[in-house]
């Protein structure tokens, strides 16, 4: 008898790929294709992308020194802002913390954008090039590739460690193989709204580093089209989703939002900067940080409530997670 999960324990290794493929097919049966999507809206965002897409290596002046003269995100978005420890830190320590936290957020964004690209390409394999969705999804994949290179370049120039998202392999496996398109669209919107809040604030803050402001501006403009597509998809297709897929999408939407916000600030940052051992606990219990988390999720929660993804049963769970007032 072969135990089904006895990997590396002296037992024969079973082939689990049919099992995984079966689960993936099951969720896809509960998904929908955007066949009723507005062609007019698709043409609008495709045309906008053709007219206004950005090459970060041409648009951004990377020669600006990555020193400690500017913050790398708005001060009030740094995890220790508003605490006694923050008050005791020098300006340079605060700036360095903002740099590491910005690069940690970039690493999380790259990780999630790669997962999204995988799901889009997986879907595109079966889509006709005559379908308008084919062109939009190709544009979105291309955008995400440029964004990942842009954020990777910023991490490299800041000369900080790569803050690899925690449990990334397990979460990536689940996302790639066990989520429906609807659930992935909800989680995509979660990532784009959360990072969009940070980017929008950074782009408008004159105290922030010029490169951070410019790459945030680029990301804000291009992600606005991605969010618009996700909004239209969910508005038109959520009513057609089966009961089981709805339940899974609701759960995954909350889970993915919590994971994304949780991953933004890697716990190793405080140790790497020589901050006191209690810094992590102080940041986690920071009331100001809790308010920022709610602000990050506010636009997402408003939309998901509008389309009934966050319903009366789901709302208390979002509040308990600290993502909803």
Report each predicted region and the residues it spans.
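Helix-loop elements that line ligand-binding/catalytic pockets
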Residues: 227-233, 250-253
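Terminal targeting/low-complexity segments that flank the catalytic cores of oxidoreductases
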Residues: 16-121, 125-134, 156-164, 168, ...
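Active-site metal-coordination segments of metallo-dependent hydrolases
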Residues: 137
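C-terminal transmembrane helix end/exit motif
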Residues: 155-159, 230-237
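Active-site-proximal alpha-helical scaffolds that flank and shape metal-associated catalytic sites
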Residues: 153-221, 248-259
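Amphipathic alpha-helical segments within well-ordered protein domains
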Residues: 121-125, 200-204, 217, 231-235
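Alpha-helical transition-metal enzyme core signature, strongest for iron centers
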Residues: 109-113, 117, 140-155, 185-199, ...
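Intrinsic disorder/low-complexity segments
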Residues: 1-24
